[in-house]
Amino acid sequence: MVKEFENKKEWALILGGSSGLGLATAKKLAQHGMNICIVYRNSRSQLDQMKRDFRKITQESVSFVSYNMDAFQPEKRKELIEGLKKELDDGKIKVLVHSVAKGNLKPMVSNSVQVLQTDDFQLTIQAMGISLYDWVKAVFEAKLFSEDARVVSFTSEGNSK
């Protein structure tokens, strides 16, 4: 496989990278030589699997850092950006992947269970829309993006219980 990002000091900042599309993106980009920074929020019960997954990324001979934090908290975002300035040294973020999901699976109509309310939609819009804007703005203002950076955002229609 061609490692077109190898030795270029380019990074992927992946928000929500401990599972699903975020993790798959991290693995694929690492295979192509891109350094990886994953922001995640997981429980201890998922820690062993996550460590195995993260180990696979480091086996691609790329730089790797991870932060277990709430990506939706402005003060945590600010702390992470300051940490990245040091961690990346003179490297830049080539791609920001927003793969965090927060919402609920309530139905719109039902006679037997609680249905969606306005605050449910506001929570989802904040987490999956405004959060993307806030992260892009913060990374841009910190001058951490490369000149030809990309932003990728995944959304979800949810899972079933």
Each model region followed by its residue ranges:
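Short, charged/polar "capping" segments at the starts of alpha-helices
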Residues: S43-Q49
